[in-house]
Structure formats: C-alpha cells, structure tokens
Amino acid sequence: MGGNKFYVTSLFKKLMDRLKKLYSEHTFTIEIDDSYEKYGQGGIFSCMSFSIINPINKNYVLISLFDNWKYHFMKHLGWEGKKMKQFFYAGGFNFLDYFDFKQISKSNTDLEFPENISEVFNSFFYNPYFDCCYDEITTLYNSNDEKKDKMFFRGWMWDFRKKMVNGIDRDDILIFDKNQVSQNLDYISYLKEIKKYLVSLSLPGGTEVCNRDIESFSIGVPVIRPHLQINYDDPLIQNYHYINCYHYCDYSKDGNPKFISHEDFQKNLIYTWDKVKTNKEYLDFISKNARDWFLKNCTIDNNLNFLLSKINLELLH
C-alpha cells in the first residue's frame, strides 16, 4: 500500500521535537545503528520503537509500536528489563497474558522482566498505518453511498488466520488474501474499498488490535472482531465501539492469537454477523462511537499529547 508517511515515523519524529522543547535543560542525541537487523525488528534499534535512555545508568523509557510485546523482555535483542522504567505499548497488552508468559518462561534465561510491571506499564493508542489522507478519511466517513450488505476482510492470511475462517462459504462474507496476486492496494483505494461494505471483519494478527481496526473506525465502518483485552486509559468497549464476536483471545504463548476452538470461533462469528447485519440503527451507533474514539485518541497530535502527559524522565535518574 502507498501513503505519504508512516504513522510510526511521524509520531516518533514529532515526539523527539517535543521532548527537546519540553526538556531544554537536557541534551537529546539520536542513536541509530544500521546493524539493527542482527537483533531483528523487535530489537533495541527497531524502527518500531523509541527509547529515551539515560547514558549514565542506562535506565530507559520505551515507547513501542512493535507487534509483539514479549520481544521487549529478551536480552539477546538488547533489552534490559530491570532498567525499563516506563513501558508504553499500544498494540495489545494485558496483565493476564503477561504473568502467564512470565510463569511459563521461568526456565528461559534470555528473559528479564521489570521488578513491578504495574508501575512500569502504560498504554497509549494504536494507529492507522499511514499519517496521511485525513481530508479523504473525513470525506469517506461523511459519504452516504449505498453499501454492500457483506462482511469484508482484506489482509495477510497467515496460517493462524486461515484456521479462523476455513470452511466459511457464504456470499455475504468476503475474505481476500493479500498473499495472492494483485490483492494489495494503495492506501486510499484500500480505505475506499472497506467503506463499500456494511461491516469490517478484523482477524487479529501479531498483536490484539490491528491498523485495520483503527482505519475502519476512522471511516465509520463498524468492526466485528474478538474481544479486546487492551488496558487503554480510554477503554475500547465491546458492543459499543466494536462488535464482539468471541469472548477470549490468548497471546501469552506466541505472537499469534490462540482460541479455545476455531470451530467455536466461526460459529460465534457467523451468529454475531447474522444478528447485527440488518440492524442499521445499531451499526450506525457503533460507527459513530468508534469514529469519536478515533478522533479523541488516534490522531497524531492527540496521541502525542497523551504520551507526553505520561512520560516521566525523573524516573531515569
């Protein structure tokens, strides 16, 4: 897909500029290592994370949009959990999965955790893929074009996603795999396509919430998805901001969601879709609530202001 600027790039650049102004008594130096690939995308030099480090004692604040929070406790990737004083994560983190992961990983000497995660963890808000096209997004939200009465998904159909929908064969449920030829679209075309349909299906990926969720919120297309357990300060409420089709999604063991039964998930998905698809008043209700949540939390400036209100550099001493 194409766009002007990646959201993560814009957010981190603006964050750096604001930090320099707010803390003019300090000197901020950007450290980038082109060899970050040896650590991988979840390593300390990943473009998906931003660390504020005290060079004297190496204490740090971590802000991450990487799609697997477990990597941030792995020593071979360069992280030191005991020196992590604040951990800001947007994609999906809850304490049940964290403590389960910690317990089942007791014998893994590569892992290092903070002394008290409840004092360290902070949420901030997930985002659309690109920082662009806000006029077009608003135009799409306000458009009243007739919709196709279908539930729609376009994305990477990894094996764990295929298991979620294998065997579903209905004309009113459309699933397009971007791994297939000619199934990847430029960004605006992608948003316009979502807007054509009654409901956007969100199949979780490497982390609980997806760019697709936020993009669908932004253009006013109701999202059907499994329950979100994210600890946002402004909570995403099931059946108010999005339509919940399944009660639980476990991320404690791998970077992929686990369900009690894929067959059970499919039954609940179809049941929920059939229940809501003719209820225009309810779908409009979800659409408005989700759009309001997006505007309040997910635009660059609002998300940045929220982050800056929570970052505490005194903890780095």
Explain the meaning of each model-derived region:
Residues 1-212, 218-219, 224-238, 248:
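Nucleotide-sugar donor-binding catalytic core of glycosyltransferases
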Residues 189-315:
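Catalytic binding pocket for nucleotide-activated donors in carbohydrate/polymer assembly enzymes
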